[in-house]
């Protein structure tokens, strides 16, 4: 239904000091640090994992060399979605509106709506990342302790412990122990931490503090002798190893569309991980309807979000 003069009755008369509701800011492009972004020229994109070789065995003198084999494993598919939104305005409403409302709706309202959908879809790759109903190409959730590999399973699911200096150190060790499908260490390093707004102050304290933020227990024995035991922040000269060693060189990023207020994710330097494919970039159109005189405005884009190599991220979802 087109927006008509009945929808904008106050804006047909002079004297309004302001028409508000269209001037709000927006939170956009939070998907950029999460995803590798590529263009696409087809209906869908596929990426296949190719397993390499295992460790080379020792060859005895005079013995035949041992052969190994490599093969394709699972395939990840990115099916592009079309996202579009439109509105129409009657010819009379356009003529009689005194406050240029429709220009603002076209410039800001459509862009805001399209950007919000894009950010929500991007964040949902992680919001659904612990749910087996949203499996990746290998048949399990993005963050799982049972990713199938040659000869067994591997995991990128961190312990369900709240974000702290200690749990982050443990997670960073797990990242460095990442192996390929044949069990060979990949030399993986962490790049950045990704969190909901609820954890931003915790992350800032952990990553920006020069000294350790790990709480310690000090006092006398727990049998009750001596002063009452107390918990406090360490007052010894322990460095913040995460910061001093540069373990997260890109720091942390807040994503306001993460729905789990306790979950956190570590991005690694493994390529071909979380990806966004852009099939058709955002475009807007305006055209009149000859019969009614209504003006119609439309915004449209096509893209897909997903992941290929699960080793690109480690995630935790504390209760």
Spell out what each predicted region is.
Residues 1-27:
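N-terminal alpha-helical "arm" segments
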Residues 2-10, 143-177, 187-192, 198-319:
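Sequence/fold signature of self-assembling virion shell proteins
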Residues 75-133, 193, 293, 297-299:
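Long, contiguous amphipathic alpha-helices that act as assembly "spine/axial" helices in icosahedral shell
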Residues 54, 71, 82, 93, ...:
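Solvent-exposed, flexible loop/coil residues
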Residues 99-180:
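A contiguous catalytic/ligand-binding core that recognizes phosphate-bearing ligands
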Residues 22-83:
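Assembly/oligomerization interface modules of large self-assembling protein complexes
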Residues 183-185:
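Flexible, glycine/charged-enriched surface loops at secondary-structure junctions
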Residues 2-6, 37-46, 64-67, 89, ...:
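Short low-complexity stretches enriched in small and charged residues
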């Amino acid at each position: 239904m087109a927006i008509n003069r009945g929808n904008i009755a106050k804006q047909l008369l002079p004297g309004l000091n302001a028409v508000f509701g269209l001037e709000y800011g927006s939170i956009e492009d939070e998907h950029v640090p999460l995803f590798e972004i590529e263009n696409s020229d087809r209906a869908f994109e596929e990426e296949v994992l190719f397993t390499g070789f295992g460790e080379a065995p020792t060859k005895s003198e005079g013995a035949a060399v041992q052969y190994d084999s490599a093969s394709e494993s699972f395939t990840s598919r990115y099916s592009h979605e079309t996202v579009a939104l439109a509105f129409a305005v009657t010819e009379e409403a356009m003529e009689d509106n005194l406050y240029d409302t429709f220009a603002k709706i076209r410039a800001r309202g459509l862009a805001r709506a399209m950007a919000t959908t894009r950010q929500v879809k991007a964040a949902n790759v992680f919001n659904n990342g612990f749910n087996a109903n949203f499996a990746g190409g290998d048949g399990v959730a993005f963050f799982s302790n049972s990713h199938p590999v040659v000869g067994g399973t591997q995991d990128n699911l961190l312990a369900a412990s709240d974000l702290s200096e200690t749990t982050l150190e443990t997670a960073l060790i797990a990242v460095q122990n990442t192996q390929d499908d044949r069990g060979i260490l990949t030399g993986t390093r962490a790049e950045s931490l990704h969190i909901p707004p609820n954890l931003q102050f915790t992350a800032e304290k952990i990553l920006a503090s020069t000294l350790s933020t790990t709480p310690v227990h000090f006092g006398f024995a727990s049998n009750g002798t001596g002063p009452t035991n107390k918990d406090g922040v360490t007052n010894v000269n322990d460095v913040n190893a995460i910061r001093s060693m540069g373990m997260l060189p890109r720091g942390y990023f807040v994503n306001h569309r993460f729905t789990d207020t306790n979950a956190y994710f570590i991005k690694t330097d493994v390529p071909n991980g979380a990806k966004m494919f852009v099939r058709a970039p955002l475009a807007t159109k305006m055209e009149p309807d000859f019969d009614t005189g209504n003006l119609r405005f439309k915004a449209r884009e096509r893209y897909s979000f997903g992941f290929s190599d699960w080793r690109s991220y480690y995630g935790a979802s504390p209760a």
